[in-house]
A protein has these predicted regions:
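N-terminal membrane-anchoring/stem segments of glycan-assembly enzymes
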Residues: 1-110, 162
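Long helical/loop segments within the catalytic core of UDP-sugar-dependent glycosyltransferases
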Residues: 83, 87, 170-194, 206-292, ...
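Cell-envelope/extracellular polymer assembly enzymes that use nucleotide-activated donors
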Residues: 114-117, 146, 282, 297
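A conserved hydrophobic helix/loop-capping motif in glycosyltransferases and polysaccharide synthases
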Residues: 117-125, 140, 215
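Short, acidic, metal-binding catalytic loop of nucleotide-sugar glycosyltransferases
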Residues: 134-144
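A conserved acidic beta->alpha catalytic loop
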Residues: 151-158, 174-175
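Catalytic donor-sugar/metal-binding loop of nucleotide-sugar-dependent glycosyltransferases
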Residues: 290, 299-318
Length: 343
């Protein structure tokens, strides 16, 4: 009888959740169902443990090892479901902020809206990548912005191309601090109210600044992160031939996990496709250089300084995903190493 009662207790909210239109409520109810199943399984599992029975050391070791593995899996699933149980959608807020920003511009000109410096960081990317990024950035629809190409490769051809394209070019005598050092060097030579970051293989959308700049009307916001959207399949999708039936790995993070973290108030900067308040960057002495994942460490520092990071689940650019397994795993290794450094 107990099983039937449990089944009905779980089936009812599941059926109701499938009928509800609000996805967050549906997701919360389904999460509650999974939590109930996890709790029931854990109670049963602990009941199978040979408490009080005489077992030799080897038997106890294997019992405890399997139980520990199961507990780790249950905790991991619980934390994941908790993270995605409620998702934010700031599209309406961005619409409202853009409308107010355009009204201010229409009534008082570009002095009434925040100026933006778009920084494109590059080291060894070729012209077939950089030309699209630079030309796309120069065509952004916003009255008060400047495009800066930060070249740590010190390439004369790139300097000439920037001059022809009408964008600014910056290099430096050394590459100290890698990407973070490159950005910090540029911050000293620029003066926009906001700083937008794009990797060399990302092309910004025409309306990218209108969609994000108005969100900084909230004086507590230090960073607005947007999705990293890709136009090509990553190396895994390409090699398995599943690009038409399976989304890229990053989409899972930016469509679900990032929105869930934002709802919990723990969104973080992912580097490219983010826009920052200059005042906030200055309060932190720029990007931290003591981690190879300077973006995540910046978020931690911003929290300590009282600045807020939010996530707008709306692509403002399109980029190039890792095309080979070597580059794919090198990138993930760097992220993992940086995460350990921050922790």
């Amino acid at each position: 009888m107990g099983f039937e009662v449990l089944f009905l207790a779980l089936a009812l909210p599941t059926a109701i959740s499938l009928l509800l239109k609000r996805s967050n409520i549906r997701r919360l109810l389904l999460t509650a169902v999974v939590f109930a199943f996890e709790g029931r399984y854990l109670a049963w599992r602990l009941g199978t443990f040979p408490w009080g029975n005489e077992q030799n050391g080897a038997e106890w070791f294997w019992w405890l090892l399997v139980l520990a593995i199961e507990l780790v899996v249950i905790i991991e699933v619980t934390l994941f479901l908790f993270t995605i149980s409620w998702l934010t959608d700031r599209t309406g807020l961005a619409d409202q902020a853009e409308r107010k920003l355009r009204e201010r511009y229409a009534s008082a000109g570009k002095s009434a809206i925040p100026s933006v410096d778009l920084l494109i960081t590059t080291y060894n990317e070729g012209p077939e990548v950089l030309e699209n990024s630079i030309l796309g950035a120069s065509e952004i629809d916003y009255p008060a912005f400047t495009v800066w190409v930060l070249d740590d490769g010190k390439r004369p051809w790139l300097k000439h191309f920037c001059e022809d394209a009408g964008v600014r070019y910056i290099t430096r005598p050394n590459n100290q601090g890698a990407k973070a050092g490159n950005i910090n060097h540029a911050l000293k030579q620029t003066k926009g109210d906001l700083v937008m970051l794009m990797d060399a293989d990302f092309v910004a959308y025409k309306n990218s600044m209108w969609r994000t700049a108005g969100l900084f009307e909230n004086k507590r916001i230090g960073t607005v992160q947007t999705p990293q959207n890709f136009f090509n399949p990553d190396a895994i999708q390409h090699n398995l031939g599943i690009s038409l039936s399976w989304c890229d790995e990053q989409s899972f993070f930016f469509r679900l996990i990032a929105r869930g973290r934002d709802a919990l108030g723990v969104a973080f900067c992912c580097g490219s496709c983010s826009i920052h308040r200059r005042e906030a960057l200055i309060s932190n002495n720029g990007f931290p250089t003591d981690s190879i994942t300077e973006d995540i460490l910046l978020t931690v520092n911003f929290c300590r300084l009282g600045w807020k990071t939010i996530y707008l689940a709306e692509p403002i650019s399109t980029g190039l995903a890792a095309e080979t397994l070597d580059s794919f795993f090198i990138q993930r290794k760097r992220w993992g190493r940086g995460g350990i450094q921050v922790a």
